[in-house]
Amino acid sequence: MIKMRDIIREGNHTLRAEAKQVKFPLSEADQKLANDMMEYLENSQDPELAKKYGLRAGVGLAAPQVDVSEQMAAVLVPSENEDDEPVFKDVIINPVIISHSVQPGALTEGEGCLSVDRDIAGYVIRHDRITLRYYNMAGEEKKIRLKNYPAIVCQHEIDHLHGILFYDHINGDNPFAADDDLVLIS
């Protein structure tokens, strides 16, 4: 089981490296990693388990964050209604954004990261809508359209696979700079 001590923090070179593509069929180690990353997200979103194991809540966890430089990330965006199915739940392997909106989007509260132990204020400007192509654990190619929060979460995780951290997208001179067409998501 992945715990907070297993998640590397900013300053570790793996977080700034270009991750390598994952080969199929998945090795036993890659299958275990994928399952463990999803288990972390599930446990971190359960208040009792999060408290028991000292987990920070997360909606995404990329392999580089656990010091494995591979293009794989677990994503679990819960529904607003606790009883509904998650908005998006999958392990995305070798993901590529194949199209995106011109319109930018950002979270009103900014973004956070399990690998960054400090608050960094500012709009993290991303695409409001994306079409994502990836492979699931079975090696099946998937294509999905995402908008708003799920699109932002996936872009954040894909950035990890390319050595980019969320604060790289914040305007250093004016962290809350926004064009008129920016979609702010609360």
Curated annotation (Swiss-Prot):
One of its GO terms (molecular function) is peptide deformylase activity. Fe cation binds at residues 113, 156, 160. Its EC number is 3.5.1.88. Coiled coil: none annotated. Keywords: Hydrolase, Iron, Metal-binding, Protein biosynthesis. Its cofactor is Fe(2+). InterPro entries: Peptide_deformylase (IPR023635), Peptide_deformylase_sf (IPR036821). The active site is at residue 157. The keyword Metal-binding applies. Binds 1 Fe(2+) ion. It catalyses: N-terminal N-formyl-L-methionyl-[peptide] + H2O = N-terminal L-methionyl-[peptide] + formate. It comes from the Bacteria. Disulfide bonds: none annotated. It is an enzyme of class 3 (hydrolase). GO terms for biological process: co-translational protein modification; translation. Belongs to the polypeptide deformylase family. Removes the formyl group from the N-terminal Met of newly synthesized proteins. Requires at least a dipeptide for an efficient rate of reaction. N-terminal L-methionine is a prerequisite for activity but the enzyme has broad specificity at other positions. This is Peptide deformylase. It comes from Lactiplantibacillus plantarum (strain ATCC BAA-793 / NCIMB 8826 / WCFS1). The lineage of its organism: Bacteria, Bacillati, Bacillota, Bacilli, Lactobacillales.
